[in-house]
A protein has these predicted regions:
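Conserved catalytic-core motifs of GNAT/GCN5-like acyltransferases
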Residues: 145-148, 165-182
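Conserved beta-strand-loop-alpha-helix junction that forms the acyl-donor binding cleft
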Residues: 115, 146-156
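GNAT-family acyltransferases
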Residues: 1-117, 179-190
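Amphipathic alpha-helical recognition patches that constitute DNA-binding helices
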Residues: 20, 109, 127-128, 143, ...
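PDZ/PDZ-like domain micro-motif
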Residues: 118-119, 174
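Conserved acetyl-CoA-binding loop-helix of GNAT-fold acetyltransferases
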Residues: 121-135, 153-161
């Protein structure tokens, strides 16, 4: 599956993307300073290659009828990162699909990682999220959420530009480089 908007393409993973993931999770890790930097994510090339190959194998035969939870982002022919979605519960905490009980209210929550730093500041992230939101709207989603931390000013600006409004703030949720930051959740009615 592939969706295009302006200079952005959201698409399913290609086998050639595996080596990008290996690089992004082992050597070119600057993006990790902005995506939950309190979590340890560094790995070795062999582990990442095996993991992403397994993921690719599990996803490559997916029918276009299946609503995607993740797309790769391409800008001007370059694989630059991904958008993804996950569920959060009524307290805005991550919850597995398997943990959701009948009748439980959950929130469709989206995120983005632009791993190629030469693309930062060129609106690729804004356009990719706008396209992902439209995809979910076309698949029946009425409201969508995104989460970040108060130190990620660029993501906050993108969320606000797209019309998200802050709906939850968890005080002093994270420590990054010796400073404490709040956890933020934003909501958008679509």
């Amino acid at each position: 599956m592939e969706i295009q908007f302006n200079n952005i393409v959201l698409r399913d993973m290609k086998e050639s993307d595996i080596e990008d993931y290996v690089r992004w999770f082992t050597t070119e890790i600057k993006w990790m300073d902005w995506d939950a930097p309190w979590e340890t994510k560094k790995s070795d090339a062999d582990t990442e290659r095996k993991s992403w190959t397994k993921y690719y194998e599990s996803m490559r035969e997916m029918s276009d009828d299946v609503v995607r939870w993740k797309f790769e982002i391409e800008s001007e022919g370059q694989h630059i990162g991904w958008v993804s979605s996950y569920l959060t519960d009524e307290n805005y905490d991550w919850i597995s699909v398997k943990q959701v009980k009948d009748g439980q209210k959950v929130h469709q929550t989206i995120g983005i990682d632009i791993c190629e730093s030469n693309i930062w500041g060129k609106h690729a992230g804004t356009n990719a999220l706008r396209t992902f939101i439209q995809y979910y709207a076309e698949n029946g989603c009425k409201e969508i959420y995104t989460q970040t931390w108060s130190g990620n000013v660029r993501m906050i600006r993108v969320a606000e530009k797209l019309g998200f409004q802050e709906c939850n703030r968890s005080k002093v949720e994270h420590e990054v480089r010796g400073e404490t930051y709040d956890g933020l959740t934003f909501m958008l009615r679509i």
